[in-house]
């Protein structure tokens, strides 16, 4: 089967932003103008195509990254609409991993928000080329050039306007295209009757100034263009387009466009810019992976290369389990068998679909560069690689942040226990930042996630999709333990109870590991002091103790253990004896290594009228917060602080009452830090009291 669109004419893009920048509305308009939907859906009416889960339609926020295919100017455009709420960072993270380009949407009034910085950093992590759409230019207080300056200053981006608005706030009548050096005037409310016109005389000077800056910046990166520009002082529309595209793909240039998606202005020009400036799969670096031999290799974006794809999302739906994949190379056919190289398991491809939000189109194959979904995969989860059995490769996977908040959950009726277990399994398969575990002491089921809203929505989904009513406990902070110094540890387990005894003995050296390493085990046994078959069990004993902690029952992180010596008995030694000895040695070592308790610290940004600045700062300090920055702009104060998560429960209510309902805040995980001694002692004694 031949390709519908050559690879050069495919664009895999994401639309990313902070909450309320108008991202879902922008996606809706793109689908309307490119012919996927024939009626405009509004987020605040709860009718948007990409917001297809019931909770999204109710709350007006986008939770899951819906993948939709559309076309524009003979190009296939695959769009992923990503959530702006920080509790759903994994959705943004996983979409950035599989995209080739991003449209970052900013509100013309609010400008750069804390969540915008998070999304921008995620795009930086994966070196995703991007362009900016400054939306909501029809709103009171809209200021295009101010937002452009914020993007340069706060995001350290090489932002360059390629458009200017004609009028602003309620009088937005058109857009100046600096590349083509002309104006587009909107003649009807649907944005379908657009008149090309000369630049209005009152804006000629400003437009000429910005066009000169644009030509200068574009020419800087291209020797051929700089010569033409120095000689003639001018670049043609074609030369500018070529230079901007080069700049976006190679030099971090960020073209900035403007408009109002809600008022149907500027959206077709955004689509034109996607085609003109954002990369095709062949324009970005080939995906890297590791061969079974351990050698690094690449897979080029080419139908003739060996098949490779990354599963970036798993979803349960009425038709079965959908696994979203990004095709990197080769062709994937319906009915074929492939290899999950991450898990070393064979999978059968039952059906293949391309999505238009919650409508689907069955296809016989997916090709390099496509985004689609597979039905019928049994063992594949988020971040797994699928490839040919003859050409195995493991592609680089996703960065998955650790959950920071947990709650106990139980069904309202005993009969729902099995349903609850099914629901939790399905939800944790979909969302790798949602973890399910059982508390060994209380036997309660504990769910952990990225924030209160995240867990609230998951509990809501249990009720809607799985018909399980659940009771939820009070939120608990996910503390961690670690060590601050080095020491030796010894564990000797010897039991003699008639007949065969038990004997295991290990000596370890313990030291702090690099941050983010978790538990690191090194075997330095020489001369067979501990036989090979007992090293694995000893390591497992240590790992299990590590997971249940030593100080207060929280997982120990960033610990390096080196097995240096030990002894065994020909008859009495067993795997179980060495597992117990490993656990004993680990506990012994930790006690001598200055163990400490760590807590999740959150980056908090609070916005309120500046009359309340003193109260806001005072309140954050009383929550053990460290204020890291503050600014006042147009009577609005912004405070950035780092605050322990444990002190932030119920903050939304407190902030509302403190600021007469006019304060808003956003919060995201920053890092783990040591808990002050007096607070740690209280937590440890409380936990030991419960045990």
Swiss-Prot record:
Residues at which GTP binds: 17-24, 81-85, 135-138
Family: Belongs to the TRAFAC class translation factor GTPase superfamily. Classic translation factor GTPase family. EF-G/EF-2 subfamily.
SMART domains, sorted: EFG_C, EFG_IV
Segments crossing the lipid bilayer: none
The entry's keywords: Cytoplasm, Elongation factor, GTP-binding, Nucleotide-binding, Protein biosynthesis
GO biological process: ribosome disassembly
Protein name: Elongation factor G
GO terms of molecular function: GTP binding; GTPase activity; translation elongation factor activity
GO CC entries: cytoplasm
PANTHER family, per database record: RIBOSOME-RELEASING FACTOR 2, MITOCHONDRIAL (PTHR43261:SF1), TRANSLATION ELONGATION FACTOR G-RELATED (PTHR43261)
A Pfam family recorded for this sequence: EFG_IV
Role summary: Catalyzes the GTP-dependent ribosomal translocation step during translation elongation. During this step, the ribosome changes from the pre-translocational (PRE) to the post-translocational (POST) state as the newly formed A-site-bound peptidyl-tRNA and P-site-bound deacylated tRNA move to the P and E sites, respectively. Catalyzes the coordinated movement of the two tRNA molecules, the mRNA and conformational changes in the ribosome.
Domain tr-type G: 8-282
Subcellular location as annotated: Cytoplasm
PROSITE patterns named among the record's database cross-references: G_TR_1, G_TR_2
Chief site of localization: cytoplasm
Disulphide bridges, residue numbers: none
InterPro entries the record matches: EFG_II, EFG_III, EFG_III/V, EFG_IV, EFG_V, EFG_V-like, EFTu-like_2, G_TR_CS
Protein origin, superkingdom: Bacteria
Coiled coil regions, renumbered to chain: none
């Amino acid at each position: 089967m031949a390709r519908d669109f050559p690879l050069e004419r495919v664009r895999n893009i994401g639309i990313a932003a902070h909450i309320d920048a108008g991202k879902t509305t922008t996606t809706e308009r793109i689908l309307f103008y490119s012919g996927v939907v024939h009626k405009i859906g509004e987020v605040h009416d709860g009718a948007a195509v990409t917001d297809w889960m019931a909770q999204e339609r109710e709350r007006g926020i986008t939770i899951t990254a819906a993948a939709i295919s559309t076309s524009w100017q003979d190009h296939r455009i695959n769009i992923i609409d990503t959530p702006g709420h920080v509790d759903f960072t994994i959705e943004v993270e996983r979409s950035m991993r599989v995209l080739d380009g991003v449209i970052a949407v900013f509100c013309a009034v609010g400008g750069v928000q804390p969540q915008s910085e998070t999304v921008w950093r995620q795009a930086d992590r994966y070196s995703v080329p991007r362009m900016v759409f400054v939306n909501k230019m029809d709103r009171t207080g809209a200021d295009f050039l101010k937002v452009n300056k914020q993007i340069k200053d706060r995001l350290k981006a090489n932002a360059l306007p390629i458009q200017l608005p004609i009028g602003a706030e309620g009088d937005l009548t058109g857009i100046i295209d600096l590349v083509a050096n002309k104006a587009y005037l909107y003649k009807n409310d649907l944005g379908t009757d657009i008149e090309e016109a000369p630049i209005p005389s009152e804006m000629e000077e400003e437009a000429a100034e910005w066009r000169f800056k644009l030509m200068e910046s574009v020419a800087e990166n291209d020797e051929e263009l700089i010569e033409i520009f120095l000689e003639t002082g001018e670049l043609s529309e074609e030369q500018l387009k070529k230079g901007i595209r080069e700049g976006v793909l190679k030099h971090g240039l960020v073209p900035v466009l403007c408009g109002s998606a809600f008022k149907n202005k500027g959206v077709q020009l955004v689509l034109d810019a996607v085609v003109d400036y954002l990369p095709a799969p062949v324009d970005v670096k080939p995906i890297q992976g590791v061969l079974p031999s351990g050698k690094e290799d690449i897979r080029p974006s080419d139908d003739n290369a060996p098949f490779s794809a990354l599963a970036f999302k798993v979803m349960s739906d009425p038709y079965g389990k959908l696994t979203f994949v990004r095709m990197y190379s080769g062709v994937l056919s319906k009915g074929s068998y492939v290899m999950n190289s991450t898990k070393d398991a064979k999978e059968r491809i039952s059906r293949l679909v391309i999505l238009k939000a919650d409508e689907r189109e069955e296809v016989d194959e997916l090709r390099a560069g496509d985004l689609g979904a597979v039905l019928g995969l049994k063992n594949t989860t988020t971040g797994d690689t699928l490839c040919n059995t003859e050409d195995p490769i493991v592609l680089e996977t996703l960065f998955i942040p650790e959950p920071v908040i947990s709650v106990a959950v139980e069904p309202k009726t005993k009969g729902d226990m099995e349903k609850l277990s099914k629901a939790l399994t399905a939800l944790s398969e979909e969302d790798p930042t949602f973890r399910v575990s059982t508390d060994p002491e209380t036997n309660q089921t504990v769910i952990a996630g990225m924030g209160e809203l995240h867990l609230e929505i998951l509990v809501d989904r249990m009720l809607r999709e799985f018909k399980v009513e659940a009771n939820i406990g009070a939120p608990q902070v996910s503390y961690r333990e670690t060590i601050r110094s080095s020491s030796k540890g010894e564990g000797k387990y010897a039991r003699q109870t008639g007949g065969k005894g038990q004997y295991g003995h290990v000596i370890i050296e313990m030291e702090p590991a690099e941050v983010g390493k978790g538990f690191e085990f090194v075997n330095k046994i020489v001369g067979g002091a501990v036989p090979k078959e007992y090293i694995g069990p000893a390591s497992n004993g240590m790992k299990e103790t590590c997971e249940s902690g030593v100080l207060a029952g929280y997982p120990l992180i960033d610990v390096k253990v080196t097995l240096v010596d030990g002894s065994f008995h020909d008859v009495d030694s067993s795997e179980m004896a060495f597992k117990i000895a490993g656990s004993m040695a680990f506990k012994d070592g930790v006690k001598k290594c200055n163990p400490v308790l760590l807590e999740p610290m959150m980056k908090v940004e609070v916005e309120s009228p500046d009359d309340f600045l003193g109260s806001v700062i005072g309140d954050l300090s009383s929550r053990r917060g460290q204020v890291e920055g503050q600014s006042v702009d147009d009577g609005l104060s912004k405070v950035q602080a780092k605050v322990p998560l444990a002190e932030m429960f119920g903050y939304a209510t407190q902030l509302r009452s403190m600021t007469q309902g006019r304060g808003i805040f956003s919060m995201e995980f920053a890092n783990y830090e040591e808990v002050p001694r007096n607070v740690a002692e209280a937590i440890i004694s409380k936990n030991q009291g419960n045990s």
